[in-house]
Design a protein with these regions (language model features):
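A surface-exposed partner-binding patch
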Residues: 1-98, 151-154, 158-165
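Structured loops at beta-to-helix junctions and adjacent beta-edge loops in soluble globular domains
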Residues: 91-93, 104, 131
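A short, structured beta-strand/loop element
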Residues: 110-111
Length: 165
């Protein structure tokens, strides 16, 4: 796996991709959530980025200001009793669909497909990457084509709710 700095350099060299200047780290509730090291490094080096904006499936890694709890945006409320209350928006497709990242200590860094029809639904909340670095690497390799986790050759990483009672 490449490191964050290498991945950002790669994005800067790709056509139809933009890297924003760094501004600040995202603000999270430090009593409940923590930023993974690779995410801290990402936001210290850049302020978000856009991958393959002229392709069929562009994706935006959000700015620190847009890095917010997902449930109030996607569901309309926090849903504190659900594990999805620990998920933050990490990407959007510019059309109202999101990818999220878990900031709870137990599942730190796991990334999920949080499109409107499957976000926070048991059995439908697919783990699409094990860390932010893993997600960024896979999105770059995907070249703006059909979502990699929906392709038949994608090896399942399980569901967000698999280890829930």
């Amino acid at each position: 796996m490449e490191n964050i700095n290498q991945l950002i350099k790669k994005v800067k060299s790709l056509p139809n991709c933009r890297v924003q200047e760094p501004t600040k780290l995202p603000i999270v509730d430090k009593n409940k959530h923590m930023l993974p090291g690779d995410l801290k490094e990402f936001y210290s080096l850049c302020g978000g980025l856009t991958l393959f904006e002229n392709e069929e499936y562009p994706i935006h890694i959000v700015t620190p200001e847009e890095f917010i709890l997902a449930n109030p945006v996607i569901v309309g409320e926090l849903c504190e009793e659900d594990i999805s209350s620990n998920w933050y928006i990490i990407c959007n497709d510019g059309k109202g669909e999101y990818l999220t990242i878990n900031l709870s200590e137990e599942r730190l860094g796991r990334c999920y497909d949080s499109f409107f029809d499957r976000h926070g639904i048991v059995g439908e909340s697919q783990i699409i990457a094990t860390s932010f670095t893993d997600l960024l690497e896979k999105l770059i390799k995907n070249n703006g084509q059909y979502w990699y986790w929906l392709k038949s050759e994608f090896e399942s990483l399980g569901d967000a709710y698999d280890d829930q009672e």
